[in-house]
Amino acid sequence: MAEKQTAKRNRREEILQSLALMLESSDGSQRITTAKLAASVGVSEAALYRHFPSKTRMFDSLIEFIEDSLITRINLILKDEKDTTARLRLIVLLLLGFGERNPGLTRILTGHALMFEQDRLQGRINQLFERIEAQLRQVLREKRMREGEGYTTDETLLASQILAFCEGMLSRFVRSEFKYRPTDDFDARWPLIAAQLQ
């Protein structure tokens, strides 16, 4: 029984990995059908549906992976690092680095892969970015408590500016078919962001 469960879990993971790889390839710039995905995995469409009730559920699973990966790591950064600017820098690097290491998932983060899918999937991505922006806002607000002084610019505006930078770099990565990596020239770009943190 345990072997059957393990085999099923492995097949589910194989399906999700194939979907992510297809999103990374030129197929990712078009709608991915279950027929194409089944062919990529080497199974029938019926076999796909034994593991996932719908393609939407496959995207849900990938979004859950993205959420778990990013939120868990952001929480670790907040636990381990106390300096406000260092926290922000690490969170930005996390977002950009995650996108760079997972090009197919970046198509999901930018909404590109979800254009032909159910609207609620885009809603989940929107909620994820709202959570990240809320975390950034909290980091910025904690500076006042931790260091006794805040910023001259509203923390809400600063948080949205930082997140807009990240989203822009991820969109550029997808638009360029993964030619322009989000972390390219980060050490030169970060001072431009940090200069706004006054």
Swiss-Prot record:
Keywords: Cell cycle, Cell division, Coiled coil, Cytoplasm, DNA-binding. PROSITE patterns: HTH_TETR_1 (PS01081), HTH_TETR_2 (PS50977). GO terms for molecular function: DNA binding; DNA-binding transcription factor activity; identical protein binding; protein homodimerization activity; sequence-specific DNA binding; transcription cis-regulatory region binding. It comes from the Bacteria. One of its GO terms (biological process) is negative regulation of protein polymerization. Residues 33-52 bind DNA. It is found in: Cytoplasm, Nucleoid. GO terms for cellular component: bacterial nucleoid; cytoplasm. Residues 117-144 form a coiled coil. Residues 10-70 form the HTH tetR-type domain. Required for nucleoid occlusion (NO) phenomenon, which prevents Z-ring formation and cell division over the nucleoid. Acts as a DNA-associated cell division inhibitor that binds simultaneously chromosomal DNA and FtsZ, and disrupts the assembly of FtsZ polymers. SlmA-DNA-binding sequences (SBS) are dispersed on non-Ter regions of the chromosome, preventing FtsZ polymerization at these regions. Belongs to the nucleoid occlusion factor SlmA family. NCBIfam families: PRK09480.1. Inhibitory activity is enhanced by sequence-specific DNA binding. Homodimer. Interacts with FtsZ. This is Nucleoid occlusion factor SlmA. It comes from Escherichia coli (strain K12). The lineage of its organism: Bacteria, Pseudomonadati, Pseudomonadota, Gammaproteobacteria, Enterobacterales. The gene is slmA.
